[in-house]
Structure formats: C-alpha cells, structure tokens
Design a protein with these regions (language model features):
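Small-residue (G/A/S/T)-rich helix-start motifs and N-terminal tracts that mark the onset
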Residues: 1-37, 164-166, 172-340, 344-355, ...
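Nucleotide and nucleotide-moiety/phosphate-recognizing core
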Residues: 1-99, 103-144, 319, 325-329, ...
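Short secondary-structure boundary/hinge segments and terminal tails
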Residues: 42, 65-66, 79-80, 152, ...
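Short gly/ser/thr-rich secondary-structure transition/capping motifs
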Residues: 58-60, 71-79, 148-152, 213-218, ...
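Internal gly/pro-rich beta-alpha loop/helix module
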Residues: 92, 97-206
C-alpha cells in the first residue's frame, strides 16, 4: 500500500494539501495528515475526513473538530516523535506547512519537523542531475507552492527546511524558485498557470533566457569595420598566471567583437599571440576594458613588482567618483569588468558601468573591506566579518549590499549567477555543473567585456552583463553536451510533455567554453 503523509499548516497552503491528500485517500492510499498548527483549512479538512484520511494533531492548544487537544507537554513530545517516524516510513511527504507569507526561519513545531526530516541552513549536497531528477529514495517530497523553511523572497536558507523532490507552484514563479540556494531545494518545478494578469508587474527577479540574451548581441552591419564592431582592452594575466590572458582574449575574440587589445608581460603576450594571432598588443582606443583576471591580489607574496597591478590601479582611478569634475570623467569612461586580482583595487565609489565579478570568497573579502570603510566613515560599530559561506547562503543580499556600498554593477558567480544593478535583479542558471573548472571565470570576464564593447548605451550594462552570464553557461552546456543546468525552466501543468531521459554530458576545461561561444551566440540570435 502507498503510504503518504501530509504536513498541514493552518492556511490556504494547508488547505491545498488537504484536498490533494483527500484525492490520494480516495485512490486507496494510506494517508495521515499531521496538523502542525492550531487549526486546519475548514473545507480541505472536511474533504480529507470524508475520504477516510487520518489526522495527527501536534499542538496541545489546537482546536480541530473531532481531534484530541489539551494533552500534556510529555504527550506532545511523543506525538512529535510519532509524526517524524510515520513521515520517514512513508513513500510520499506532502509539505504544506507554510506559504509565501512567512518571514524568517521556521519556529516551533514546523521547525522541529523540518530539522528531523530535512536540513538546517545548509544547501543540499547531491549530484547535479538533469531536470533535477530524483535519486528515487523514499520518501519523495512534494512541496505545495514553496518548500517550507526557505527564504521565499530572497532565496536564502535561514534555518531548518525540507528539500523537495517536486515543487508545485501556483500562478507565477516565486523568487525562491529561481534564486540560490533555495532553488536547489525546490527539486523539479511544476507551474500551475492560473491566468493571472502579471504583464504590467515589475518582477522581483528577471530570469535570463535566449530571447533576453539576444538583445545584447550586436548584429553586424554592411558598413562595419573592426573598430565599429567593438574593441576590447585586456589587462589580464601575469607572470604567475599567464594562462588567464589567453582565456580572456580567446573568449573576447569569439564573442562578436572586432578586435582584442592586450596589455601585459612579455610571457603572457607571447602566449596570447600563439593562441590568438588576431590579438593586437599595446595601448589604443577601446570600447570596454577587462582587468584583473589572472592578476594576483596584493596579499599574494611576490606581487609588489607586478606591473599589471600598477596599470590596473592607474586605470581604475579614472572611475573613482568624488568631485563634480571627477564624476563627469568617471561617467564618460567606457565600461570596465573588474575581476579577481583587481577587486582589491576598486575605488570606494564607482559608476554603474563598472562591473565587478566576484565568486563567493572574493565577495566576502570585498564586503569586509567596504563595510569596514563605511563603519569608520560613519563612526559606527564594526560589522561581523563575512565568510564565503555567508555569501553562498544568501547571495542575493550579498550582491545587493555590494552594489549599495560601491555603486558597481555586481555579477556574483555561482551555479545560478546573480546580477544586481540600480533597478534590477537578474538570475542566470544556464550553466551545467561541469562549468566549475579552473579558468571558467576568466572566460566569463572576456565574454562580458566583449558584449559591453558592442553596446552604445551604458544604461544597458546590467542587462548586458546578465546576458553574458547566460551565454557563458550556454557555451558550457554546448561544450559539455549537457542538458543539466543550475536552474531548469518549470513544466506547465496541463500541457502535454514527452517524458525522456536528459543528458548529463561530460567534463570540460575552460578553453572548451571559449571555443563554444560562437555556437552559443548563434543559438540565441537564431
């Protein structure tokens, strides 16, 4: 016999769960509803009882018709342990404890259940399978609208939560379904379209797709030259890490630009020319800059005499905001991608055409530096230091804070990459997990600089950067022949879908991604 357990809250989500549980009971399943609050949705409860479902109440203060209440604290503890045991032995758990109205972490009985049945504040650690396919272990978990315990609006994991095998969401996608790390707790996402009129609504998060990214690709004109198609200037690579120069140049050259100019040490110059004879060595007019990839931070031993850092520092001074004249000069500068070893050279305030591209560890260092400066300037108490794990567990808040502190457009790298500018949040989850490989960030930096060089208006910087993240992931998917992604589009309930096994793909190196960029661009503009 199929055994199912419903974790039912008092609200409408609990009601939806009760109706679903009633349908299962009518089909012959052995269904137990565990009431986690003091009441249950009236109509849903009546339907469930008529179908022969059983109810286990956990709160002594509950007022649910026909169910025990007023029991002792000792019995309440025994009931909780019984509920946990029944849930663990079931084939299916329907998670309908909480809805979109909850703020912060779970508390009380829901928190105790989530701690026992799920995870507490850490992201799921499991193989990245295509379409979030389940390992098949029981119990499977079906979340109603959102998994209980995730940060609905910011994608965080503030405390105990229950990872879902499948999440059925209603009307529209919730931010937690697309933002990391909560999106990884949603499993496969099924969307029930209620026909809501949301076209005139500003989304909390914009998910990048082919159509979105195509706008960032400048189609060639009949009268184009190498200069009008966009020239990218690179101050990347170093004596220590010359390969980064090759990767940024290779990516930029393959991303629809007319020319790549390279500035760097002789060893890196020779490697760039060997890999890309089309590159031009030396200074000249550019439409965008990429700096810092493969350049050691100041904290790395032996970087005192690194001319790359001196060149980058001199260039970034032109982007520093301050006096009225300085501001005008800064806003007149071309877009610049500040990556890796250049992040510690970033001025205190910069305009939005400055793009920073940290991973979680680099973001933690950057936030600590700028928070300390802000606290000193405001004579405020020092902040608690950020760690890389802090950033990974709440990347949206970290990216927003970095934008507030610096003014830069922020690209925070991850399985789902987040881009934040003055008015928007973008999420791109096109990349397969195979993209976690050395040099992938260098390729992204070069690709981003190339797309920025093609734009006429710096007001589109955020959209362009988000499109670069998407194309980067798409190129990795092409190179690895993988259909696994950081974020999968939901299935629309009611539409016919052909069930098929998706392709996991194979390992790649960063150079493979750079070489797949032209095919990715062809895909989005087709």
């Amino acid at each position: 016999d199929m055994r199912a357990v419903l974790l039912a809250g008092a609200g409408d989500n609990g009601g939806d769960g009760l109706f679903a549980a009633a349908a299962l009971a009518q089909e012959g399943a052995n269904v137990t509803a565990i009431a986690v609050g003091r009441s249950l949705h009236e109509a849903g409860f009546a339907s469930f009882v008529r179908a022969g479902g059983k109810v286990l109440v956990l709160d002594p203060a509950a007022d649910i018709p026909g169910c025990a209440s007023g029991f002792s604290a000792g019995e309440a503890g025994e009931r909780l342990q019984t509920a946990i045991a029944v849930a663990r032995k079931s084939h299916l758990i329907i998670d309908a404890m909480t809805g979109i109205g909850i703020q912060g972490s779970l508390r009380g009985i829901p928190a105790a259940l989530a701690s026992a049945l799920g995870l507490d504040g850490e992201a799921p650690d499991e193989p990245a399978l295509p379409n979030r396919e389940s390992s098949g272990d029981f119990p499977l978990v079906l979340a109603v609208d959102t998994p209980s315990g995730v940060g609905v609006n910011d994608g965080s994991l503030p405390g105990p939560y229950i990872p879902a095998t499948v999440t059925v969401t209603f009307g529209a996608m919730k931010p937690c379904a697309v933002l990391p790390p909560a999106t990884f707790a949603c499993g496969r996402i099924e969307l029930l379209d209620f026909g809501f009129d949301i076209d005139d609504k500003d989304p909390d998060v914009e998910v990048v797709d082919n159509s979105f990214a195509s706008d960032a690709v400048r189609l060639p004109r009949f009268e184009d030259s190498k200069y009008s198609r966009g020239v990218v200037g690179l101050v990347t690579g170093s004596q220590r890490y010359p390969g980064a120069a090759v990767l940024t140049a290779s990516a930029a050259a393959r991303a629809n630009t007319g020319m790549v100019r390279y500035l760097g040490p002789e060893r890196a110059q020779n490697m760039v020319l060997a890999a890309l004879p089309e590159a031009v060595i030396g200074k000249g007019h550019v439409q965008s800059w990429v700096v810092g990839s493969g350049v050691p931070e100041a904290s790395v031993e032996g970087t005192d005499g690194d001319m790359q850092r001196d060149t980058i520092a001199a260039l970034l001074k032109h982007y520093a905001l301050g006096s009225e004249d300085e501001n005008k000069d800064a806003y007149d500068m071309p877009p610049i991608v500040v990556d890796a070893g250049a992040l510690d050279l970033l001025p205190e305030r910069v305009p939005g055409q400055v793009v920073i591209t940290p991973h979680a560890g680099e973001m933690a260092k950057l936030l600590n530096r700028f928070e300390t400066a802000a606290s000193t300037a405001e004579h405020a108490d020092s902040h608690e230091p950020y760690t890389a794990d802090d950033v990974r567990l709440n990347p949206l808040a970290s990216a927003k804070r970095a934008h507030e502190l610096t003014g830069a457009t922020v690209l925070l790298k991850g399985a789902v990459t987040i881009v934040v500018d003055e008015d928007h949040v973008y999420a791109s989850g096109s990349a397969p997990a195979w993209l976690g490989t050395a040099g992938a960030g260098d390729v992204l930096a070069g690709l981003t600089g190339a797309l920025l060089a093609q734009q006429d208006d710096v007001a589109t910087t955020g959209e362009t950067v988000a499109s670069a993240a998407y194309l980067h992931g798409l190129a990795a998917a092409i190179a690895s022949e993988s259909e696994q992604q950081g974020w999968q589009e939901p299935e629309l309930i009611g539409r016919e879908h052909r069930q098929r096994f998706m392709t996991l793909g194979h390992p790649i190196v960063a150079g493979d991604v750079a070489h797949a960029i032209p095919e990715a661009i062809a895909d989005v503009i087709a």
